[in-house]
C-alpha cells in the first residue's frame, strides 16, 4: 500500500516542466529571439542585428557603428492529452468510460528581447537579453490523467477491496456487521506550472579576413542563464462512492472502522474468541492504512518555486564568398541546478518528494546546440536561406524520481537521440529604394521521444512550422519587423504508459501560435 501513495507523490512532484515553452527549438531552448526569426526562421546564415543570437560572427560584417534591435512577442498554446485507462471506468464523474480528454491553456503575452552591437574597425562587441527558455504559464483546470490514475490506483488497491475483504471475514465467522462496499471514486484535479529562463550574452567577433570577395569572421562569447519556475498541484474533493451515495474519504474510512468495531463487539458478546482475534487484526491493519490516508482527507496541495543560475561559452564562425554566406555556431551545455523554495519541508513521508523538498536542488541543464546556416543571394534583393540545428539533449542532465522514490539525473538518456531541426526560407526586397522586404520560411523539428520518456506532465511532439512577415525600412536608420509563426504538432501515441496500469495509453499533441514585432535601429 505504501507504493500506491508513493505514486501519488511521484505523479505530482515530477511535474517540473509543465509550462508553456513558447519556442521553436529543442527541449529547453527558445530559438525565436527576434521578430526576424518569426517572419523567416532560417536566419542562421543571415547577416543582421538578429545575428547577435543566431549568427554572432556574421554581425562583424555589418557597417561600423551601433546597431540595436528591440522585440516583443505574444505566444499562445494548447496542450491536448487523450488518456485511456481501465481505472477511469470507476470514476463516478466519467460515465463508465475508460477515456478522458485533458486540455491545457498557456499564454505568454509579453516576451521581450533586445540585441545590441557596436562595430569598430575589425571588431564587433555584442550583447543580448531574452527569454531563452520557457516563457509562460500553462494551466490544466481539470488536472491530468496521471493525477486521476493515481487516485484510481488508491481506490483499486485499497478502498475497493477493503470492504469486500471485511465482509467476507465477517461472514466466515457468522458476524452480522456490514462494511460499506465501494463502487467507485471521484476527485477534482488542478495543475499549473510556469517557467522562465532569462538569458543574456556578451561576446565579441573579429574579422579574420576582410577582402572584397571573401570575408571571414570569428566569435567568442558567454551566455548567462537565470531560471525561475513555480509549480502548483491540487487534488481536492476526494470521495468514495458506495451503494448509499458518495462519501468524503474521511467519512468512508470512519464507516469502515465502525463496521469493524460492531463486528468486534458482536464477537466478544457471543464468545467467538477466534473471530474476535481476526477482527482485532483487521482493525490494526485498517488503522495503519488509514494513517497513511489521513493526510489526504482534505486533498493534496503542493507548491514549489525554483531558481537557478548557469553559464556557458559560445563560439561562432562566418564565411562570406561573393553572394554565398556560411555560418556556424556552437553553444556549450549549460549546467543548471534549480534550488527549491517549497511547502514540502521534509522527505520522510515519501522519498519522491526529494525533487521539491525545501532547500534542495535538482538538475535542469540546457543542452548544447550546434547551428549551421547558409544564405544565397543570386540576385540583388533575393535571398534563399537554409539551416540546421542539433540539440545534444541526451548529454544534458535532468533529474527525475522513479516510482520507488529513487533519484536519477539522467532522464534524458531515455531519449533515443537529440533534437534535429531543418529550416528553409526566402526573402525578397521590393518597392521604392527596396524599403519593403517580404519573407517566409519553414522548420521541421524531430525529437528523440520514446514511450518511456513521454508523460502528460512533460511532453513535446515532432512538428513542422511556418513563419511569414514583412520588414519595412522607415528610413536609413530604422526598420520595423512584423511576423506570424505557427507550429503544427504531430500526434504521439504512447502505447503503454510506463507509470500506469496495463492497458492504458496516451495521445499527445499541441497547438502553438506566435505573433511578433520588432524595431531595428542603427546609430
Language-model regions: role of each:
Residues 50, 107-112, 194-200, 307-313, ...:
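Residues that define the transmembrane beta-barrel architecture of outer-membrane proteins
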Residues 68-76, 127-131, 220-226, 328-332, ...:
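Transmembrane beta-barrel strands of outer-membrane/channel proteins
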Residues 80-87, 138-145, 230-239, 244, ...:
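Outer-membrane beta-barrel translocator domains and adjoining extracellular loop/strand segments
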Residues 509-523:
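Outer-membrane beta-barrel "beta-signal"
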Residues 97-102, 185-191, 298-303, 355-361, ...:
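Extracellular loop and loop/strand-boundary signature of outer-membrane beta-barrel proteins
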Residues 58, 109-118, 127, 200-206, ...:
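Residues on the lipid-exposed face of transmembrane beta-strands in outer-membrane beta-barrel proteins
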Residues 20-140, 146-153, 459, 485:
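N-terminal, post-signal peptide beta-strand-biased segments of exported outer-membrane/organellar beta-barrel
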Residues 66-67, 122-125, 211-218, 323-326, ...:
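Repeated loop/turn-to-beta-strand initiation elements of outer-membrane beta-barrel proteins
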Amino acid at each position: 500500500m505504501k507504493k500506491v501513495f508513493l505514486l501519488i507523490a511521484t505523479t505530482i512532484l515530477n511535474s517540473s516542466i509543465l509550462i508553456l515553452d513558447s519556442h521553436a527549438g529543442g527541449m529547453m531552448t527558445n530559438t525565436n529571439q527576434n521578430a526576424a526569426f518569426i517572419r523567416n526562421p532560417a536566419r542562421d546564415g543571415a547577416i543582421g542585428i538578429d545575428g547577435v543570437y543566431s549568427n554572432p560572427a556574421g554581425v562583424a560584417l555589418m557597417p561600423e557603428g551601433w546597431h540595436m534591435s528591440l522585440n516583443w512577442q505574444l505566444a499562445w498554446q494548447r496542450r491536448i492529452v487523450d488518456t485511456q485507462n481501465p481505472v477511469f471506468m470507476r470514476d463516478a464523474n466519467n460515465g463508465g468510460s475508460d477515456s478522458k480528454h485533458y486540455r491545457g491553456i498557456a499564454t505568454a503575452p509579453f516576451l521581450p528581447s533586445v540585441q545590441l552591437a557596436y562595430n569598430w574597425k575589425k571588431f564587433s562587441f555584442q550583447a543580448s537579453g531574452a527569454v531563452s527558455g520557457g516563457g509562460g504559464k500553462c494551466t490544466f483546470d481539470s488536472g491530468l490523467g496521471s493525477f486521476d490514475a493515481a487516485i484510481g490506483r488508491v481506490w483499486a488497491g485499497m478502498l475497493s477491496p477493503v470492504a469486500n475483504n471485511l465482509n467476507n471475514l465477517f461472514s466466515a465467522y457468522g458476524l452480522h456487521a456490514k462494511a460499506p462496499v465501494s463502487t467507485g471514486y471521484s476527485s477534482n484535479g488542478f495543475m499549473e506550472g510556469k517557467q522562465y529562463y532569462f538569458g543574456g550574452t556578451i561576446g565579441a567577433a573579429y574579422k579574420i579576413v576582410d577582402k572584397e570577395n571573401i570575408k571571414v569572421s570569428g566569435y567568442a562569447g558567454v551566455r548567462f542563464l537565470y531560471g525561475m519556475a513555480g509549480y502548483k498541484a491540487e487534488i481536492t474533493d476526494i470521495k468514495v462512492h458506495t451503494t448509499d451515495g458518495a462519501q468524503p474519504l474521511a467519512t468512508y474510512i470512519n464507516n469502515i472502522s465502525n463496521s469493524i468495531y460492531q463486528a468486534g463487539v458482536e464477537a466478544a458478546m457471543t464468545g467467538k474468541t477466534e473471530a474476535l482475534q481476526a477482527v482485532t487484526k483487521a482493525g490494526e491493519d485498517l488503522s495503519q492504512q488509514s494513517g497513511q490516508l489521513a493526510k489526504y482527507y482534505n486533498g493534496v496541495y503542493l507548491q514549489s518555486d525554483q531558481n537557478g543560475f548557469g553559464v556557458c561559452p559560445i563560439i561562432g564562425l562566418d564565411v562570406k564568398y561573393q553572394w554565398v554566406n556560411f555560418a556556424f555556431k556552437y553553444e556549450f551545455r549549460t549546467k543548471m541546478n534549480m534550488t527549491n523554495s517549497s511547502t514540502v519541508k521534509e522527505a520522510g513521508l515519501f522519498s519522491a518528494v526529494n525533487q521539491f523538498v525545501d532547500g534542495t536542488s535538482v538538475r535542469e541543464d540546457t543542452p548544447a546546440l550546434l547551428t549551421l546556416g547558409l544564405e544565397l543571394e543570386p540576385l540583388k534583393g533575393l535571398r534563399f536561406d537554409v539551416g540546421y540545428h542539433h540539440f545534444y539533449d541526451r548529454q544534458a542532465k535532468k533529474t527525475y524520481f522513479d516510482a520507488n522514490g529513487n533519484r536519477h539525473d539522467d532522464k534524458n538518456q531515455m531519449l533515443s537521440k537529440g533534437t534535429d531541426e531543418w529550416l528553409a526560407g526566402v526573402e525578397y526586397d521590393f518597392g521604392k529604394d527596396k524599403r519593403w522586404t517580404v519573407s517566409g520560411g519553414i522548420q521541421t523539428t524531430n525529437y528523440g521521444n520514446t514511450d518511456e520518456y513521454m508523460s502528460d506532465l512533460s511532453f513535446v511532439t515532432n512538428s513542422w512550422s511556418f513563419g511569414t512577415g514583412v520588414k519595412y525600412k522607415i528610413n536609413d536608420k530604422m526598420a520595423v519587423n512584423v511576423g506570424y509563426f505557427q507550429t503544427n504538432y504531430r500526434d504521439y501515441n504512447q502505447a503503454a504508459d510506463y507509470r500506469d496500469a496495463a492497458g492504458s495509453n496516451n495521445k499527445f499533441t499541441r497547438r502553438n501560435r506566435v505573433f511578433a514585432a520588432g524595431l531595428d535601429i542603427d546609430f
